[in-house]
Amino acid sequence: MGKDVALDFLPSSLYSCTCSCDGKLAFCDSEKVQILVPSTEANTPKFMKALAYLDDVEDELPNCQMLAPNELRLGDLTPSVISRYVVWSPTGLADNYDPLLTVLTNRHRVYFFSSSSRVLHQKWTCVAQMSTHLPSDPLELCRIHSVAWSPLVSLPSSSPWGVCLFALGAESGHVHLSIMSHSSTPFFKSFDLNCSWVVQLSFSSWNVVGDSATCLLSCSSRNGEIRILKIAISSHSDTFDTAMQELPFSLDYRPFSPLLAWSSPLANVEYLALVYPGHLFAFRYDKSLGKFCSFLNHNLLSLCSPSGVLFGHNDIDTIYVYILTHSGTLETFSLLDNSISMLDSPERHVLEKFLNNHLQNYGSVSDDSIKTLKIHGFCPSPYLSSAALHFSISYPASFTYVVTAAERSYFNFIPSLFSKSVFSHMITSSLNNLCVAPSAGCLLEISLMNDTLKEKTDIFTMLTNSLSSFLVTDYDFFLELKHLIDISSLSNLYLDSSLNAMRLLYGWSVYKQKALDATLLNSLRYRLTLYIMLYTLSQISLDPSYLTSDCKAVLRNFVSFTYKELAEVPIAMEVANEIAKSLEVSSDFSETCPACEATVQFNNTSLATCDNGHVWRRCSVTMLLLSQKAAKYCAVCNSIVAIFNPSQTKCLLADLQNELSICFYCGGHFLVS
């Protein structure tokens, strides 16, 4: 377990704690947001601390003197901008952007923050303001009271980055929805829910059928009205369809909004939680039937207003509900089939022991009863291997000591005891679809699990044993690939379980062991080369003008590489000969040095040296020389890829740039150098 991290501010009365898919944490305070960035480098702290300031967004705020008295809100009258809620986007939206930090302020505006430093992540600045994408009249339409991101979903023939939905709840009773993907800008469609201020939003998981997917968006208003939108998207369209869906159960009306949260799916079932002061409702939704089937309810111990509700699960049949109150208490329940009960499991005891240990470790006062612990934020990590806990300790016995201690807050991870089931869930998710399971986040979760296990285990051995059934030889892979009738998309390279298994092993060797696994790297390169050549042959048969001169240069490298490395593999040679015949490429093809025009023989896939000694790096995908070309590099394994400006919108280079938009070798996201 990592050492506590002391945060830079006293927790405000507005509780928020959020964890990104790549392991970053954000904690909400008044005029700034504390951000913790995980570090895997040797001899460095576990987390690098940074702050996002809201000072630079004040000039965008409305002039209070221009507002009528009935249009004024409390946030308009405060002297400074205050963060009310923070949440991470499920992915970055462009190269050089990790998941964006979404901040909702007391002035009912929403901003995206990102780090401008790619190394230390110390400077976080505003990169987008959502009010510029919303209607400005009437004012209620652009006053935002709630924010939510859907999970990522990857559809056939779509970008490896996946797509997601971004929702804003407005004061007018509208929900603004936008589809977000790689290199996209927000374009909102507004839906009138016929209710008061929309103050709570929560997305369910996606239900994918063929090339379309659906999810539910649950909404609650300030006056307690509940609305549910069913949203459908398709890989053939840039827009989406919506329809209202009713809860088939009647609840006693309560004139205030509950907290909302959806669980992750378990055996094709997920739960929608509605949490009121003193009461919890859990609605069971069957994804295969597409409807709510039953609901459970339970009284809470605390009658305080809830400030957060989160879900987790430990194995194949139990879902947990974590409820945090404004008084700083945390209640945990288990959902099993048709029952709900206060959780009394090993994980509960771990939590209590963890908190009691912290109460004993802070200060030198002998009487532990005078120490007070408050939990300000509790957030399970994306893969549930641990939970982020934000807490503070106060000592009311001494006024002087109260001031000293109360101005400190801390963060730590609570490890999960169900490491085997969590590990299995993590591996399964990564094998099925690397697109919606970012490599950096998955590897960080495995690293956290490795650090918190009582019995030290060789994670590489665990990974190898778990993935052994998915690892196939290069020859078997080539044989299966050669029998494919039509290779229509390069994105399918990220949906192959064998490739994803190799990516996990290779990514772990680089991420934790700080060493390249040459065998895995070469095998991945062999498979990439053959797949691209087969894809090219498929595209040439449809469009003879598919290849530009630059595209042909890439294929010449592929042919040379195949002749050199795979000369004893008949299947690979057959494909290379077919490409060479159409391009009239000889087996002794050579390149020209960009500096002196001397001959460069193709002897290495990473480096190229001309006859006069000039050394050039090669693109890890195309193997072209990186002379004057712009390039980007993977944030996980540091592989370098050239940025091309293809002369045609539909050609091999354009497809490589668009469809291989995350690292082929480990699934990491690219940074622009």
From Swiss-Prot:
It is found in: Nucleus. Keywords: Nucleus, Transcription, Transcription regulation. GO terms for molecular function: histone acetyltransferase activity; RNA polymerase III general transcription initiation factor activity. It holds the Pfam family TFIIIC_delta. One of its GO terms (biological process) is transcription initiation at RNA polymerase III promoter. The keyword Glycosyltransferase does not apply. This is Putative transcription factor tau subunit sfc9. May be a component of the TFIIIC complex.
